[in-house]
Amino acid sequence: MKPSLFKSLYFQVLAAIAIGVLLGHFNPELGAQMKPLGDGFVKLIKMIIAPVIFCTVVSGIAGMESMKAVGRTGAVALIYFEVVSTIALIIGLVVVNVLQPGAGMNVDPATLDAKAVAMYAQQAEQQGVVAFLLDVIPGSVIGAFASGNILQVLLFAILFGFALHRMGDKGTLVFNFIDSFSHVFFGIINMIMRLAPVGAFGAMAFTIGKYGVGSLVQLGQLIVCFYITCLLFVVVVLGLIARVVGFNIFKFIAYIKEELLIVLGTSSSESALPRMLAKMENLGCKKSVVGLVIPTGYSFNLDGTSIYLTMAAVFIAQATNSHMDIWHQITLLVVLLLSSKGAAGVTGSGFIVLAATLSAVGHLPVAGLALILGIDRFMSEARALTNLVGNGVATLVVAKWVGQLDEKKLKEQLVHRKNEVKSV
């Protein structure tokens, strides 16, 4: 029993995170120097994401009997994303108004260092609905894969899958080649995941070493509020959705515990994307549903980021004594319904979207971003974890609604997790 525990990725990542925290706390300088380990692991994961998505989506769509089923899956997914993301935004808005973590800080926006957030504000200027939609269309296929833009690769994969499906028997050779190629990529993922403990150690040691546990004290109230809100959202909202669909949210969380620990160490839900594709398929979801819902969810279904955006925006208003009546907050909510769709599941994207939102709303000081710049890194873990669980639940919900879920397999995997395929 013990050897299997020590060999499990779950234990190794958990131990690596703990060691990283200790190193960063007791030797901050050395801990901060561990950053390349975390960055290197995330880059290795990103290296494989584009081809994995392409192969999964193409083989899933091309292998379906009806193209109408693909369109229905996409429509159901987008409706679900919009409804649940809106609920997340509203919950964040309600909690921050009730607890008021920024009240009493009395910060003068003129005293804040606007230069510290200038980079984010500049990137935020490029955010917009039209710009976002145009960015989904790649300048070239090679460019989409080279940049690792998930939505661009997804668009090309969908078109490729449709075209391959229309070829009928003539496309069998190409279909078999791509399907076989996907197994090679998942084999590469298995090799990369052996380095997950190293990546988690480096990222956590850097975070604690650079920012220190002490930096959490002053603005700790916002962090605590945010973590509690994310926890409540997962347990109550996603838990209720899971119950309606027919599974237990806690058993599902236990099923993806290794992916959650990887995300905890890297602060990016994108780092677990390749494994989630395989695990959701192993859970009983058809490949076509998994290939569409999860990659799309990384831009349209970021529940943790949605909660963060409303809480952070109102927190800045409270801290700087910027008045926000009910109409201002409704305006904020409407703006976030659009701007939040431009956030990808990578570290720091939520902060850029927040800068874009403050600029769009107008009456909130963009310089107020400096207040949470130092603690944003500590909130990214909760964002990423909530995003990952949210996308997993979304996949099961959509698969259930479109009749592409093997419920018997779902129950078997969640109840008897020991039967989980080891190749994932």
From Swiss-Prot:
Pfam families: SDF
Bilayer-crossing regions: 4-24, 44-64, 76-96, 142-162, 184-206, 222-242, 326-346, 352-372
Listed GO MF terms: fumarate transmembrane transporter activity; malate:proton symporter activity; succinate transmembrane transporter activity
InterPro entries on file: C4_dicarb_transport, Na-dicarboxylate_symporter, Na-dicarboxylate_symporter_CS, Na:dicarbo_symporter_sf
Entry's localization field: Cell inner membrane
Broad class of where this protein is predominantly found: membrane
One GO CC term, this protein: plasma membrane
Annotated membrane topology: Multi-pass membrane protein
PROSITE patterns, per database record: NA_DICARBOXYL_SYMP_1, NA_DICARBOXYL_SYMP_2
Assigned keywords, A-Z: Cell inner membrane, Cell membrane, Membrane, Symport, Transmembrane, Transmembrane helix, Transport
GO biological process, one term: L-aspartate transmembrane transport
Entry keyword Phosphoprotein: no
Family label: Belongs to the dicarboxylate/amino acid:cation symporter (DAACS) (TC 2.A.23) family.
Function noted in UniProt: Responsible for the transport of dicarboxylates such as succinate, fumarate, and malate from the periplasm across the membrane.
Annotated protein name in UniProt: C4-dicarboxylate transport protein
The organism of origin for this protein: Erwinia tasmaniensis (strain DSM 17950 / CFBP 7177 / CIP 109463 / NCPPB 4357 / Et1/99)
